[in-house]
């Protein structure tokens, strides 16, 4: 017997990331090849015609799992009974725009979306914020949805995680799928800290295999941190397909589990690892039965502490920059 359809809301539905995302969701890559989905697509009034064009293409794929599509510019319609919400749309930084103005512009969007989720989404909704600044946007949405569990709100660090995996595979000569126990700490920004001290490849310690502190400090960490900028420089456009792929990975693992493997998610802090409560901070997690659980008790050396505190400082600055815009 067919499963009842799950409702997946996607914001910024006319955008580049969504264009790489929607067809894969409809194909079963997000929730499984036996799970029908209803897509609930949100974008601005002026983007509705473009969204309709994307839906025409979705129709033309005749996906067996696509049970319906809703197109709207109203968050309360888009998030109605949503089981998953992918918050992809955000205000991009325009030329000459100060960071604080970017934070304020996004705070307006994510307070409205958080409040709408609070009002109409499933109480078990899984929220992933992709739109930047992702961690702080997720924090704003979470704070605007007091009736939903905080744990429902996450930010995407999976792109950083996947970028780090790829760099480590290239450096070590090991297959990317063989690398386990990688962590990426902190903010989805150039300050984040990819940490392979615990990582293994085919059971061997990657740290011993690579054995190059200078490469770690001067090449690996900056390459992962600045990868997005490098792609814009090369392509003239920001990374969309790889971001969509990471969003799929993040939610699929959250829903279907990681079989004991570590992945990175931006989640509300419980105070562990010296991160103040509620800050949405990238940590290694293991997912099982639709829940994530942070990997606990990892040793933090002096270099790691410095890196983790550096990315935390940026997140605290962002939090303080939007505090006056939040009610609670």
Swiss-Prot record:
The active site is at residue 188. GO terms for molecular function: L-malate dehydrogenase (NAD+) activity. Gene3D superfamilies: Lactate dehydrogenase/glycoside hydrolase, family 4, C-terminal (3.90.110.10), NAD(P)-binding Rossmann-like Domain (3.40.50.720). Pfam families: Ldh_1_C, Ldh_1_N. It is an enzyme of class 1 (oxidoreductase). Keywords: NAD, Oxidoreductase, Tricarboxylic acid cycle. Transmembrane segments: none annotated. The keyword 4Fe-4S does not apply. One of its GO terms (biological process) is malate metabolic process. Belongs to the LDH/MDH superfamily. MDH type 2 family. This is Malate dehydrogenase. The gene is mdh.
């Amino acid at each position: 017997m067919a499963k009842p359809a799950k409702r997946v809301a996607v914001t910024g539905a006319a955008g580049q990331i969504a264009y790489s995302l929607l067809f894969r969701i409809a194909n079963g890559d997000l929730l499984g090849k036996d799970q029908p989905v209803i897509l609930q697509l949100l974008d601005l009034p002026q983007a509705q015609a473009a969204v309709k064009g994307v839906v025409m293409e979705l129709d033309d794929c005749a996906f067996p799992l696509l049970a319906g599509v809703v197109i709207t510019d109203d968050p309360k319609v888009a998030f109605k009974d949503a089981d998953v919400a992918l918050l992809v749309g955000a205000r991009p930084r325009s030329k000459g725009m100060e960071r604080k103005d970017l934070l304020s512009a996004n705070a307006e969007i994510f307070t409205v979306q958080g409040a709408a989720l609070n009002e109409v989404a499933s109480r078990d909704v899984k929220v992933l914020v992709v739109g930047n600044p992702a961690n702080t946007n997720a924090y704003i949405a979470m704070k605007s949805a007091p009736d939903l569990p905080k744990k429902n709100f996450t930010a995407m660090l999976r792109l950083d995680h996947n970028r780090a995996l790829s760099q480590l595979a290239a450096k070590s000569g090991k297959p990317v799928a063989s690398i386990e126990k990688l962590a990426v700490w902190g903010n989805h920004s150039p300050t984040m800290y990819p940490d392979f001290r615990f990582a293994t490849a085919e059971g061997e310690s990657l740290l011993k295999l690579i054995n190059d502190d200078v490469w770690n400090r001067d090449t690996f960490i900056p390459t992962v941190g600045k990868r997005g900028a490098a792609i814009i420089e090369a392509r003239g456009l920001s990374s969309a397909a790889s971001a969509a792929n990471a969003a799929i990975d993040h939610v699929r693992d959250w829903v279907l589990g990681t079989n004991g493997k570590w992945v990175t998610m931006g989640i509300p802090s419980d105070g562990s690892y010296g991160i103040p409560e509620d800050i949405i901070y990238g940590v290694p997690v293991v997912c099982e039965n639709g829940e994530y659980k942070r990997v606990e008790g990892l040793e933090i050396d002096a270099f790691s502490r410095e890196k983790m505190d550096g990315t935390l400082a940026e997140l605290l600055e962002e939090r303080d920059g939007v505090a006056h815009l939040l009610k609670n």
